Amino acid sequence: FGGFFGSRLMSNIREDKGYTYGIHSYFQNHVHASAWMISTEAGRDVCAATITEVIKEMELLRNELVDMEELNLVRNYMIGSLLGDLDGPFQLIGRWKNYVLNGLDENYFYKSIETIKSVTPQELQRLANTYLQPDDFYELVVI
């Protein structure tokens, strides 16, 4: 959605609209709960328009199937990111610490890779309809 340069948010809000230099989305995972964050720096004059565009992108995911070209691009990015997290002893121990703190076993990594490889556009749309409910989100704007 917004984790890399070719993402939907970057394409729309940076490249098409020019509202910001960068916009990102990521999960903030904790032991008992997680939060999905979207962050950017945009001018005061385009702040409301930026939020509107983020909501439009959520609606697109809820109402239209992701095409296979985009899905494969995101799959490759996600698998590359997971593998990059294993590049060195500090990254490895950080990943294992996360597994231990969250009660996950050693197969979690392999299950994650398999899920990324096998998820379908229909499953993504179902998940978007379950979790991307704009009325359930909080907006924090700092000026």
Where are these regions (language model features)?
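Short, hydrophobic/aromatic alpha-helical segments in well-folded domains
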Residues: 8-9, 127
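His/Glu-based metal-binding/catalytic segments typifying zinc-dependent metallopeptidases
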Residues: 1-7
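Extracellular/periplasmic catalytic domains that process cell-envelope and extracellular macromolecules
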Residues: 132
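Low-complexity, intrinsically disordered Gly/Pro/Thr-rich segments
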Residues: 120-129
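M16 family metallopeptidases and their MPP-like homologs
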Residues: 10-63, 68-119, 135-143
